[in-house]
Amino acid sequence: MNPSFESKLMTLLDDHQSEIIELRRYLHEHPEVSFHEKNTATFIKDYYSNLDCKVRDCGDCYGIIVDINPDKPGKKLAWRADFDGLAIQEDNDLPFKSQNPGVMHACGHDGHTAYLLVLAKCLIELKDEINGSIRIIHQPAEEVAPGGALSMIKDGALDGVDD
């Protein structure tokens, strides 16, 4: 990554900090356990609906692939985040605590997803400066074996990815 591009990307990410927090809190309030992330997957796909990218379902689970500059020659880089919650009761009084009894985000997948959504948005904004393509991988069911990754890999999530 050249220093100028990196600086622009970091500035954009800084400019979107409040959006990252808002997305993370929404996701934290609406966790779903592995292989039942239907609403989360819909939320993720809806986020991309007005952005200049190609979105598709991936795997026989709720996996999502987002391609930026899919036909541009050069390396294909990938970023990945998981988005399932855990079957744990959240016991606190935070204004954004889980609204789903017995399910919570206890290990950061809400944050991973929020950050990846905004990273993708910023990369789309800078897409003309990218020498190649970007693949964004939203993986469900990371908390159980074999999880959603295997299904996504079999359905081509990593096909053509260089790094």
Residue ranges and their predicted role:
Residues C107-H109:
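Membrane-interface loop-to-helix entry segments
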Residues G111-D163:
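Acidic/histidine-rich catalytic neighborhood of metal-dependent amide-processing enzymes
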Residues N2-H105, A114-L117, K121-N131:
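Acidic/His- and Gly-rich active-site-bordering loop/insert found
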